[in-house]
A protein has these predicted regions:
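A charged N-terminal "starter" segment
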Residues: 1-111
Length: 112
């Protein structure tokens, strides 16, 4: 049985809350973003605070987008997922000394 695009029968055996990611829809969305932003004078960055699931991050990084991070942990997750350090921006306020060192040690693009 399906409800919209969701195969409900696959989910009936799960007894715990979970997230369902439609990877095909993500792929189509990322394709469209890349297509619409190529040859533009700006660069797309994904905000890790929205969702730091490593599988999703790897997929997004594979499109050549940058990462917008607001913590040292997000900087590390971005690098681990394959975002080039040259496209990692560390934004936000209240960075600890340790977080600043993480950014510097990984040679990220900039601090905001």
């Amino acid at each position: 049985m399906t409800k919209g695009q969701f195969p409900l029968d696959k989910f009936q055996a799960l007894e715990t809350p979970f997230y369902y990611y439609d990877m095909e829809l993500l792929h189509l969305t990322l394709d469209k973003i890349k297509e619409e932003t190529e040859n533009k004078p700006y660069h797309i960055h994904y905000a890790l605070k929205a969702n730091a699931n490593p599988v999703l991050l790897k997929r997004i990084a594979s499109y050549g987008f940058g990462a917008d991070c607001v913590s040292g942990n997000e900087v590390l997750r971005a690098i681990e997922a394959g975002f080039p350090a040259s496209q990692v921006v560390f934004a936000g306020v209240g960075k600890t000394d340790k977080e600043i060192v993480i950014g510097l040690d990984n040679d990220i693009y900039c601090f905001n």
